């Protein structure tokens, strides 16, 4: 494991969050995918494991296509300098489709990032139960008037 200072990890997370926020606003996930090393590994408990930046890029672009308005606000963050890790809980959040001031539709996710240095991440793992939580949340959002921007392009590899 690589040791990184807290300041370096905080800066890396700031860059990661900015790239993710840009992708959420524009639908272009390339800037976010470029934050991973060429040999990065992304472990996604419902969709499977993706090895390499280009496989991560292809997956994230397809999986996020139906949800251009989804955001990922963080509830808490922990920095592990000894292991170069950043852990956080975020919400997978869709805005209320009929009432801008209404409650969002969301479910929690724990993420573990491993920082490789030089502004790149070697690993990300998302821990949640999308087969249960995502289905319920998206169904409720659609029932409230939400519309998918595209059809689903990726099937879950693991289900309840």
Where are these regions (language model features)?
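A solvent-exposed, acidic/Ser-Thr-rich amphipathic alpha-helical stretch
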Residues: 29-84
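A structural signal for well-ordered alpha-helical scaffolds and beta->alpha junctions
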Residues: 13, 53-56, 106
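General structural signal for alpha-helix termini and helix-helix connectors
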Residues: 22, 42-45, 97
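Short, low-complexity N-terminal intrinsically disordered segments enriched in polar/charged residues
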Residues: 1-34, 38, 155-160
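A beta-strand edge to alpha-helix "cap/lid" segment located at domain peripheries
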Residues: 2-7, 61-160
